[in-house]
Amino acid sequence: MKFPASVLASVFLFVAETTAALSLSSTYRSGGDRMWQALTLLFSLLPCALVQLTLLFVHRDLSRDRPLVLLLHLLQLGPLFRCFEVFCIYFQSGNNEEPYVSITKKRQMPKNGLSEEIEKEVGQAEGKLITHRSAFSRASVIQAFLGSAPQLTLQLYISVMQQDVTVGRSLLMTISLLSIVYGALRCNILAIKIKYDEYEVKVKPLAYVCIFLWRSFEIATRVVVLVLFTSVLKTWVVVIILINFFSFFLYPWILFWCSGSPFPENIEKALSRVGTTIVLCFLTLLYTGINMFCWSAVQLKIDSPDLISKSHNWYQLLVYYMIRFIENAILLLLWYLFKTDIYMYVCAPLLVLQLLIGYCTAILFMLVFYQFFHPCKKLFSSSVSEGFQRWLRCFCWACRQQKPCEPIGKEDLQSSRDRDETPSSSKTSPEPGQFLNAEDLCSA
C-alpha cells in the first residue's frame, strides 16, 4: 500500500496558504489598505469553502448521518480531519486482516507488441485510501485555480504598484505558485489515469520533475504577463479576461449543443436536474479557470458519462499554445508601448525577451515530457519527434516546390518564343531538371 504523500502535500499547501493569506490580510488592515485586505480574504476564503464542499461531495457525507464531520467542515477543518483519517487507515491497514476484497483487472504497458492483463486484490482499506486520494486531488485543483492563481496575480500586482516586496507577501506568492504548479501537475496525472483507465499507469520521478518544470515556466510567465499588462492598461485587461472566460466557458456547452445529446442525468443519483446543472456549471468554471493560466490537459466533454474526453487531441494542444504565445507577445508589446515611469529602471526589451523565452522553455519541457517521460507513450499512434519530422518534410517539400516555379515559367515563355521564331522541324530538348513534378520533388 502506497504512502499517502499526495494527501499530505495537499493539506500542507492548503494550511500554509490560508495561514499566510490571513496573516497578510491583517497586515493590510493595520496599514489601512482595506481593498487589498478584502481581495486577499476573498481569494483565500472562497477556495476554502469550495474545498470543503468538494470533500463532502466526493465522500457523499451530505446524505449520511455524520454531524461531527459536517461541523468540522463548517469550521474549515475538514481537510485536517480527512488527513488524520487517512493516516489512521494507513497505519492500521497492516494489523487487521480484511475479510472482503475486490478484484481489479488492469493491462500492462505493451512489451514487444504484447500486453498482459493482470489481476490485483484491493481491500477495503486500500479502497478508502484511493477515494481519499481522489478527493484531495480534486480539492488541490480547485484550490490552485480558483484561489491560488488569482491570489498570486493580486499580490504580484500590489508589489509592482507599490514597488516593494514584503516578507509576508513574498511568502504568500511562493506558496501560491507552488499550489498552482501542484494543481496543474495533478491535472496531468488525472488526465493520464482517466484516458488510460484500462492500463496500469506508473509515473516515474523524472516525469514528475519534467511536469513540474513545464508548469512552473508556463504559469509564472503567464502571471507576469497579465500583471504587467494590468499595470498599464487597467480597463483593457477586463476585456482580455472576459474574452478568455467566455471562450473557454462556452466551448464545452457549444460542443454539447451541437452533438444533440440528451442532458446528462447520471452524474449523481441524489442530484436533481437543477443540482446536476449547478455541478456542470461549476466544472465548466473550473475548466475555464485552469485554461486561463495554463493548458488543462483534461478536456471537458459534457455529453460523455465520465464528463472527460478520453481521446488525446494534439491539434487542440497545438492551437492552444500557438494562440497563447501570440496573446502573450501582443500583451507584452502593448505593455512596452504604454509603460509608465514605475518601469524606469527596468530594461523593457530584455524583460520581454526573457518572458517569451520562458514560455518557449515551458513548451520545450512539455515536448520532452511527451517524447521521453510520458508513462503511456507506447500507446501513442505517433510521437512528438515523428510529428515534427513529418511537418519538416512537408515544409521542405513546399519550399522546394515553390522555388522552381518562377524559373520554369520564364523558361517556358522563352522556349515558346523560340518555337515561333524557328522552323517547325527543329525541336529543342528540355533539360530534365526543368519539368520535375511534385511527386519527384517529394521523393527527392
Curated annotation (Swiss-Prot):
Its main location: endoplasmic reticulum. Residues 24-37, 90-140, 193-208, 257-277, 339-349 are extracellular. Residues 423-432 have a biased composition (Low complexity). Residues 408-444 are annotated as: Disordered. The keyword Nucleotide-binding does not apply. The modification Phosphoserine is found at residue 115. High levels in skeletal muscle, heart, brain, and pancreas; low levels in placenta, lung, liver, and kidney. Not glycosylated. Pfam families: XK-related (PF09815). Residues 1-2, 59-68, 162-171, 230-235, 299-317, 371-444 are cytoplasmic. Residues 408-422 have a biased composition (Basic and acidic residues). It is found in: Endoplasmic reticulum membrane. The keyword S-adenosyl-L-methionine does not apply. Keywords: Amino-acid transport, Blood group antigen, Disease variant, Disulfide bond, Endoplasmic reticulum, Membrane, Phosphoprotein, Transmembrane, Transmembrane helix, Transport. It is a multi-pass membrane protein. The chain crosses the membrane at residues 3-23, 38-58, 69-89, 141-161, 172-192, 209-229, 236-256, 278-298, 318-338, 350-370. GO terms for cellular component: endoplasmic reticulum membrane; membrane; plasma membrane. GO terms for molecular function: protein-macromolecule adaptor activity. Belongs to the XK family. Heterodimer with Kell; disulfide-linked. Interacts with VPS13A. It is linked to McLeod syndrome: A multisystem disorder characterized by the absence of red blood cell Kx antigen, weak expression of Kell red blood cell antigens, acanthocytosis, and compensated hemolysis. Most carriers of this McLeod blood group phenotype have acanthocytosis and elevated serum creatine kinase levels and are prone to develop a severe neurologic disorder resembling Huntington disease. Recruits the lipid transfer protein VPS13A from lipid droplets to the endoplasmic reticulum (ER) membrane. This is Endoplasmic reticulum membrane adapter protein XK. The gene is XK.
